[in-house]
């Protein structure tokens, strides 16, 4: 016996060790069965952690039998599995582990009573195979392999006899004539999966693949950007409902383009160069209710509209806060240079009405006297000024206010 074989005598392989088990605890446990001359736990070279197994060598080889007879063994709360280490030269030759049954030449180390039958006619069943092969001996089992998807024979199978002599007689005739077709017969070599032959249902280790729910790659429902419109200030709007001038996004692949910026509303200026008042006094939560021109007043502003954006026009084709010309007169000639006086009275533009949002109204100087405490302007047609006003004292030399006087 060589030195390698002598080194294996009296050695035990110990598997199932706990990660916390050390060489000292392993030696201490097996010392109760005899003198331990060597003890090692195999560790990972990178992490230096236990790999869960090790080796124990006794001085007396007979201690190995004592350990094996004292099963089960528990160390650090786990059941360990000690096995004797057999020298490599003394290990019996084993065939390579395989799966299922395989046709092939006869092997003395793996004899069986099963034969492989290939090329079986499509109209031949298990009954016909049993009737044919029973002339070689007692048939104990007939297995035909079927397609798992189509559920029809694949053209080969296995026959099991009661004794090995029947197998030898069937294999001596390499080709057999069954129902007018030449069939090949070989000895079947056993594999690990003896209870299940290849091709039977359930033999595949891969599950069926799930087909996608949509051929174009979209599964379930379209992207969320296709399902809602654009609302002001982040409001959610159901699909298909237009709000704020934006309709539902266009159909097609990909996400819809971003919405355009809000369109600015143009406020026209009346002839004469006098612009309309702009801005609102502080402390007001809503813009004043203007009533320019003819017709009913515009609807109240949308409280959900974005800040700084005027409400939509009350009538189609007219912009908010615009100053349309009176319907009774023709539109002014814009080719003429501006003059100091307007072409028509102020009242037709709505300046004589109450602008409650500003705290005071704009009056027509040709119809109402100024309210600044000065004397009335000759020809104005108004009553004399009162004794109190906004001026500094009762100075009769102060002329009345006129919006176009500089």
Curated annotation (Swiss-Prot):
In this chain, where does the modification Omega-N-methylarginine occur? Answer: 253
The UniProt keywords, alphabetically, are:
Acetylation, Cytoplasm, Developmental protein, Differentiation, Methylation, Nucleus, Repeat, RNA-binding, Spermatogenesis
Question: Which stretches does UniProt call biased (Pro residues)?
Answer: 247-262, 295-315
* Record CDD domains: RRM1_DAZAP1, RRM2_DAZAP1
Residue stretches making up the RRM domain: 10-97, 113-190
- State the compartments where it is located: Cytoplasm; Nucleus
Q: In which tissues is it expressed?
A: Mainly expressed in testis. Expressed at much lower level in liver, heart and brain. Also expressed in ovary. Expressed throughout testes development, in both the prenatal and postnatal periods.
Give the top-rank taxon of the lineage listed in the UniProt record for this protein. Answer: Eukaryota
Quote the biased-composition stretches of kind Polar residues, using this chain's numbering: 195-207
Key word Cytoplasm present: yes
For this chain, the Swiss-Prot or TrEMBL PTM comment says:
Acetylation at Lys-150 is predominantly observed in the nuclear fraction, and may regulate nucleocytoplasmic transport.
| Residues with N-acetylmethionine modification | 1
Note the SUPFAM superfamilies from the entry.
Answer: RNA-binding domain, RBD
What does the annotation say about its assembly with partners? Interacts with DAZ and DAZL.
**Protein name per Swiss-Prot or TrEMBL:** DAZ-associated protein 1
Q: Which organism is it from?
A: Mus musculus
Q: Its encoding gene is what?
A: Dazap1
């Amino acid at each position: 016996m060589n030195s390698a074989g002598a080194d294996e005598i009296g050695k035990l392989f110990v598997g199932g060790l706990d990660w916390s088990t050390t060489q000292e605890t392993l030696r201490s446990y097996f010392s109760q069965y005899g003198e331990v001359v060597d003890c090692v736990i195999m560790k990972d070279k990178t992490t230096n952690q236990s790999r869960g197994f090790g080796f124990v060598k006794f001085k007396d080889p007979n201690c190995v039998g004592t350990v094996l007879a004292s099963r089960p063994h528990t160390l650090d709360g786990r059941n360990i599995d000690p096995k004797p280490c057999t020298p490599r030269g003394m290990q019996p030759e084993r065939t390579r582990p395989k799966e299922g049954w395989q046709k092939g030449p006869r092997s003395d180390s793996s004899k069986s009573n099963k034969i492989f039958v290939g090329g079986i006619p499509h109209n031949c069943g298990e009954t016909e195979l049993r009737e044919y092969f029973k002339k070689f001996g007692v048939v104990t089992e007939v297995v035909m392999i079927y397609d798992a998807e189509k559920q029809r024979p694949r053209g080969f199978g296995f026959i099991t006899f009661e004794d090995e002599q029947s197998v030898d007689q069937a294999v001596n005739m390499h080709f057999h004539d069954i129902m007018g077709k030449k069939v090949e017969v070989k000895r079947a070599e056993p594999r690990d999966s003896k209870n299940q032959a290849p091709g039977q249902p359930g033999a595949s280790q891969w599950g069926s693949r799930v087909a996608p729910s949509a051929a174009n790659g979209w599964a379930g429902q379209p992207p969320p950007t296709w399902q809602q419109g654009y609302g002001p200030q982040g409001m959610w709007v159901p699909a298909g409902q237009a709000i704020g001038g934006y309709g539902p996004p266009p159909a097609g692949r990909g996400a819809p383009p971003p919405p355009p910026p809000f369109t600015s509303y143009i406020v026209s200026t009346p002839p004469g160069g006098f612009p309309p008042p702009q801005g609102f006094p502080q402390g007001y939560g809503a813009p004043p209710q203007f009533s320019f021109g003819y017709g009913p007043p515009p609807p109240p502003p949308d409280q959900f509209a974005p800040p700084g954006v005027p409400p939509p026009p009350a009538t189609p084709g007219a912009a908010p806060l615009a100053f349309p010309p009176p319907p009774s007169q023709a539109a002014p000639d814009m080719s003429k240079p501006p003059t100091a006086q307007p072409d028509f009275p102020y009242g037709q533009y709505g300046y004589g009405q109450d602008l409650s949002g500003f705290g005071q109204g704009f009056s027509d100087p040709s119809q109402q006297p100024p309210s600044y405490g000065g004397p009335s302007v000759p020809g104005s047609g108004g009553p004399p000024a009162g004794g109190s006003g906004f001026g500094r004292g009762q100075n009769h030399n102060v002329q009345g206010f006129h919006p176009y006087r500089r």
